[in-house]
Amino acid sequence: MSYPLHLFWHRRDLRLADNLGLYAARQHTPTVVGVFCFDPALLQGQDVAAVRVAYLLGCLQALKEAYQQRGGCLLMVQGDPRQVIPEVATTLKATAVHWHEDVEPYARERDRVVAATLNDLGIAVHRQWDQLLHPPSAVQTQQGQPYTVYTPFWRNWSALPKAAPVPPPPDFAPLEATEIASIPLPSTHDLGFDWSGELILAPGEAAAAQQLAHFSQHAIYEYGEQRNYPGRPGTALLSPALKFGVIGIRTVWAASEAALEHARSDEARASIRTWQQELAWREF
């Protein structure tokens, strides 16, 4: 039996678990192909260092292996995504492309162009929010404007119900009529960077989950004080994982709520609340 093929375009969501768009794509069809596009416009940014690219490549390697373990595949391409994503969708005869919304102006314009091109080709587009616990439109003043002061933002944001993490998608159906050539993962040198050092933080979904588990069982209870001392292991060390989306924000929030339930003192609960406010700050 053949199934329609859907693409899931990975960007800042390099994971299988707690991935809303990927889970939704798998509900539509068992034949889902992941795709990641190395965008020169982003790789050439002034804030892009070799270590950042090395971490990204490590995350992609882990994601590729996770897809393979579930019978699927992750396709990696390079070029302007405004052209490349529609080309990949057309080549694979995809009937739909899924991705997550972004807040950055460049990403929003890029996505608008890609969506328009896909619509012209008769390919469905499915988009939803994933990187935030609440989309920007959900947290506004009584006048319907974004908050400019954090305290009332936090008060409103924290009162909203938080969605639970979604499970990893079921195994993918093996491809039948469509053959996808294996594209090797490029090195940092291939992408124009030189890096021969070791990463301080291990890349990938499994490593991020392990780091979250360790933090939420230990340092989170003293975070309010220990975060002020750089020489102490008092922080979560999850910033890179959240930036590249190798761990879902709903998973992170759920871990903090579980820690609250196990807190044995007011000081511990206050520390956890302080960390939760840092998570809210990401969305302010």
UniProtKB/Swiss-Prot annotation:
It comes from the Bacteria. GO terms for molecular function: deoxyribodipyrimidine photo-lyase activity; DNA binding; FAD binding. This is Uncharacterized 31.6 kDa protein in atpI 5'region. Residues 4-133 form the Photolyase/cryptochrome alpha/beta domain. It comes from Synechococcus sp. (strain PCC 6716). Pfam families: DNA_photolyase. GO terms for biological process: response to light stimulus. InterPro entries: Crypto/Photolyase_FAD-like_sf, Crypto/Photolyase_N_sf, Cryptochrome/DNA_photolyase_1, DNA_photolyase_N, Rossmann-like_a/b/a_fold.
